[in-house]
Amino acid sequence: MIIFSGGTGTPKLLDGLKEILPEEELTVVVNTAEDLWVSGNLISPDLDTVLYLFSDQIDRKRWWGIENDTFGTYERMKELGIEEGLKLGDRDRATHIIRSNIIRDGASLTDSTVKLSSLFGIKANILPMSDDPVSTYIETAEGIMHFQDFWIGKRGEPDVRGVDIRGVSEASISPKVLEAFEKEENILIGPSNPITSIGPIISLPGMRELLKKKKVVAVSPIIGNAPVSGPAGKLMPACGIEVSSMGVAEYYQDFLDVFVFDERDRADEFAFERLGCHASRADTLMTSTEKSKELAEIVVQAF
């Protein structure tokens, strides 16, 4: 199975999937459009979250970073008047240093991810969506800013006028992702932000055409008219997409076969059928590993 993932939502579902399926059977294609260089090192927030999940390092209270990490380097930089913007943990920073050194030596982002997976003892196949640089910028009332500046620096507060995924039309799907598509028929679109997490992956040239040839199941990150987490509630309207499960399904319509949405959502199942996909209700909140496992079982049965 191939799973498309961002840094929130989908990792919780992955937590359930790895409880019911051998990790070797999971290929996770991860968004890289939120990556940025900080203090000379490449930060890949979504990749790091997935790597830390599969290596049992993740801070499960925040669902990002490493559990019990320290912040000595960040605090020392701050004391010296250097503001990094992102509060990076010391052990987390080691991941970034290893990745960046591999890339500086001429290897790809995929190569660095495969190496980190090996160092962490991960059995799942974790891959960046592309080896080419792609960056999401948010057009706001306060100006245009990188997604991390919008979401972390500004806490997602500015009014959003548009979203620009820079470099995506020139980027290529990574060779190892294409290789995985040759072997797998089942694709899961996880419940991550459809605009800034899943959007960059499916916007890569040729990706939607590949998906049309596969069995695609998607899980909604929206309940009612609000996202479970993250800034999708502001980003979707700015892109002309309704903040609802229906809005998400319509965004995926050209390749979607099965759509799983929350049991508390009042959306009409038959409305999804009219889009050409089968609809299924489930508890999508994933408030515990057991809940994640229950949703994972429903999703696997949908294929």
From Swiss-Prot:
Complex and partners: Homodimer.
Protein name, per record: 2-phospho-L-lactate transferase
Enzyme Commission number(s) from the entry: 2.7.8.28
InterPro entries, per database record: CofD, CofD-like_dom_sf, FbiA/CofD
Sequence positions that bind 7,8-didemethyl-8-hydroxy-5-deazariboflavin: 48, 87
Coiled-coil residues: none
Reactions it catalyzes: (2S)-lactyl-2-diphospho-5'-guanosine + 7,8-didemethyl-8-hydroxy-5-deazariboflavin = oxidized coenzyme F420-0 + GMP + H(+)
GO MF annotations, alphabetized: LPPG:FO 2-phospho-L-lactate transferase activity; magnesium ion binding
SUPFAM superfamilies per UniProt: CofD-like
Pathway connected to this protein: Cofactor biosynthesis; coenzyme F420 biosynthesis
Family, similarity comment: Belongs to the CofD family.
Cofactor(s) this protein requires: Mg(2+)
Entries under PANTHER family matching the protein: 2-PHOSPHO-L-LACTATE TRANSFERASE
Keywords: Magnesium, Transferase
HAMAP family: CofD
Biological processes annotated in GO: F420-0 metabolic process
Role of this protein: Catalyzes the transfer of the 2-phospholactate moiety from (2S)-lactyl-2-diphospho-5'-guanosine to 7,8-didemethyl-8-hydroxy-5-deazariboflavin (FO) with the formation of oxidized coenzyme F420-0 and GMP.
Pfam families named in the record: CofD
Enzyme type, top EC level: transferase
